[in-house]
Amino acid sequence: MKVEELRIDERIKEVLKKRGISELYPPQAEALTSGILKGENALIAIPTASGKTLIAEIAIVNRLLKEGGKAVYLVPLKALAEEKFKEFKDWEELGLKVAMATGDYDSKDEWLGGYDIIIATAEKFDSLLRHGSSWIRNVKVLVVDEIHLIGSRDRGATLEFIITQMLNRAQIIGLSATIGNPEELAEWLNAKLIKSDWRPVKLRRGVFYQGFVFWEDGKTEKFNSWEELVYDAIKRSKGSLVFVNMRRKAEKTALELSKKIRNFLTKKELRELKELAESLEENPTNEKLAKALQGGVAFHHAGLGREERVLVEENFKKGLIKVVVATPTLSAGINTPAFRVIVRDTWRYSEFGMERIPILEIQQMMGRAGRPKYDEVGEAIIVSTTEEPSTVMERYIKGKPEKLFSQLSNESILRGQILALIATFNFSSFREIYDFLERTFYAYQGKDPYTLEDRIRDIVYFLLENEFIEITLDDEIKALPLGIRTAKLYIDPMTAKIFKDTLPKIEKDPNPLGILHVISLTPDLIPLPYGKKELPMLEDEYYSFKDRLYFELDWEDERKFLRAFKTALVLNAWINEVPEGEIVEKFNVEPGDIYRIVETAEWLVYSLKEIAKTLEYSQDVINYLETLRVRVKHGIREELIPLMELPMIGRKRARALYNAGFRDLESIKNARPAELLEVEGIGAKIVEAILKHLGREVKIVQKPRKGTLDYYLHP
């Protein structure tokens, strides 16, 4: 179907023409003529790279141009929010303003009222609903990308609560991978189901077993090893994406492939890859990445820093990196297709031991094969070492993905959501809570909300006992200040209880390590794991720092305690300005893990401070916690705090300024630019920016130094 034939605003057609889109894929045409443009709900369950986002874009923009109002586009990951934000920016030329909202869960963000299209993570939007942001009543369209995550243990319940809240308030468009029970999900949403297996690039799937690829069409092809599949793709000037089940395996595999693949590269490519490797910040994880990069290979997992992940994704898309070995984080929606996808593992470790990776996830990995516009066909191959190819084929290639089931019974999330219903949506009786639950996917799947009755009563009594709520003489449930603050902080009531119980000890004897250990014990922070080899070090450190902790080692739950303790030690090293590389080496963590726990820890220290305020602790306690929050955010000692308000100044530059004698803003403001330029890591642009921030406009013209080539060319 031609774009011209669509009954949409002509201005939309112009923007699509500029993008080079004149024809729609069959599932796009089906979706856009199904009633979605008339405001009807839709569930679009089609393969990866079949143009789901474009359907949502056209539906949103057409509706907003016609009626005004707002649209919210929900994504599961911050990185995906950034990607979608860039895509939606195209529509600003039609006068629609696009904003992105992630993180900071303690804000109404009324500034978003000035925007038309808001890209947000589910958790952020859930927190905005709790804060009662006034602009939400103007939301006409809610798009839920990766809606199949409603079946995920971690985030499913949050997504389900959001959709239940918005079902009768806005048009719902769900974008999903191929799932086992789309009809059931569509019926709950009262949505038209658009289901298709059509792909813009044909997908050829097979199983590698004992030296042969057994293709689903019955053909076989000989390859001496699975690695030969990668080398073969490179000889054909194509890239490969290899999925493995563990970070360490991703790194090891990338380094092994790199040794051989460098022989296939041109001198120009080797030179560019060397430059890329040299641009990485120094730390043990990046050393391995740099080594792999020099052979045209990279690994990609959640332990990489954000900049490194972006660098890998962009250079793989460009074709400079030939192979990426990834854990399934890359298959979670980030747009990085490859000609050939190789799935090395169909099992993974979990807290319950080894378990099969779900069919849905394997099929999503395989769906990354084939790059629209570049490949006529994409190839996805599962490597089997023990199972017969026919068994693997039946299960993962011909098999139907698992059905989605509501995760509303997840106690931790249910605790927070029930408090939110009482504290921010003013539900005042058990009856109202049950009525709400009757509208959920949980109830739709035939599960009687009253089967949750015992659990809900337990949660309500927990909230009552810990002074989050009260029950009046008229049997009305009312939120108390602690309950209201906890719901708006977007933390688990159990976290708030731990804070409440520990604050008297903190007031008596405040110390950073003890506080960092407390927040690491809460359900809102996933603590760092540790291996057997680390146990002696952790036990030694525990006996050294025992007096600083507010909890003693619980031998019955030693693992939980020591994971939290290791996390606290990492955070403590971070706020004492231990270089990142040293932290990575000493504590056997990855840079990405440091960023993850720092971001969550800052939020939890802030929440602890807010709970202290609500419970009317002294200003000294509140100031102490605010100082610690800033230290956690920037990774600095206390004396550097005044310097952190300067633009372009991070922990390293702040320390360099301090050590050079610039210990406060006044001394920097009164300094000569030449003095500031002598500080390590401080260049002309930075001097101009920090002085401008302090009210001094300067323009620095740097003359070339004597003896340099530039001096002779431009004396």
UniProtKB/Swiss-Prot annotation:
Residue ranges constituting the Helicase ATP-binding domain according to the UniProt record = 33-197
Q: Which GO terms describe its molecular function?
A: 3'-5' DNA helicase activity; ATP binding; ATP hydrolysis activity; DNA binding
EC category name: isomerase
Enzymatic reactions: Couples ATP hydrolysis with the unwinding of duplex DNA by translocating in the 3'-5' direction; ATP + H2O = ADP + phosphate + H(+)
Motif location (DEAH box)? 145-148
* Positions with a binding annotation for ATP: 28, 46-53
Question: CDD domains per the record?
Answer: DEXHc_archSki2, SF2_C_Ski2
Query: EC number(s)?
Result: 5.6.2.4
Q: Which family does it belong to?
A: Belongs to the helicase family. Hel308 subfamily.
What are the boundaries of the signal sequence?
none
Record-linked InterPro entries? DEAD/DEAH_box_helicase_dom, Hel308-like_dom4, Hel308_SKI2-like, Helicase_ATP-bd, Helicase_C-like, Helicase_Hel308, Hlx-hairpin-Hlx_DNA-bd_motif, P-loop_NTPase
State the organism named in the record.
Pyrococcus horikoshii (strain ATCC 700860 / DSM 12428 / JCM 9974 / NBRC 100139 / OT-3)
Q: What is this protein's record name?
A: ATP-dependent DNA helicase Hel308
Task: Show the SUPFAM superfamilies listed in the entry.
Answer: P-loop containing nucleoside triphosphate hydrolases (SSF52540), Sec63 N-terminal domain-like (SSF158702), Winged helix' DNA-binding domain (SSF46785)
Give every Helicase C-terminal domain span.
Answer: 229-422
Name the residue ranges of motif: Q motif. Answer: 1-29
Q: What interactions and quaternary structure are annotated?
A: Monomer.
Source organism superkingdom: Archaea
Keywords from the named record: ATP-binding, DNA damage, DNA repair, DNA-binding, Helicase, Hydrolase, Isomerase, Nucleotide-binding
Query: Alphabetically, which GO biological process terms does the record hold?
Result: DNA repair
Q: What does this protein do?
A: DNA-dependent ATPase and 3'-5' DNA helicase that may be involved in repair of stalled replication forks.
